[in-house]
Amino acid sequence: MHISLPTRNKSYFRIRTRTYQIGLYHSDSSPIRDISVLHLLIATLCTIFFPIFFSLSKVQVVQWQGTTISKNCIALTMSFPLNAIPGMYLIIAFPRLQTVIPLQRNTPVRITKSVIVKGAVSVPRISSPMH
């Protein structure tokens, strides 16, 4: 497991393994600059217990509240404990496949087309869809 802090090229905190990486974003899509022990603990626990508590789906199109968020990404199909923290974002991605998915309490994530294809390298800076 590799833990990298914000650098010049990648300004978001992440914990990366062979298959996925987790990043934490504020609600305004700005990266977290001050890495607290809580953030590190949450991300570490998520990395360790990820296969137990979460169900991943390889998807081509992800829709959140009827709005298409991103293509070529992986989305959660279950709730994420981090949504107890208001305005938190979760990044889950295969290598070279990165996306930002806003997760809130009782937020349905609609998944279509269970096909994974190669996508862009950059993390899209998206805003929350209007309610």
Curated annotation (Swiss-Prot):
GO terms for cellular component: membrane. Disruption phenotype: Increases sensitivity to copper. It comes from the Eukaryota. Keywords: Membrane, Transmembrane, Transmembrane helix. GO terms for biological process: copper ion homeostasis. It is found in: Membrane. Signal peptide: none annotated. The chain crosses the membrane at residues 35-55, 74-94. Its main location: membrane. This is Increased copper sensitivity protein 3. The lineage of its organism: Eukaryota, Fungi, Dikarya, Ascomycota, Saccharomycotina. The gene is ICS3.
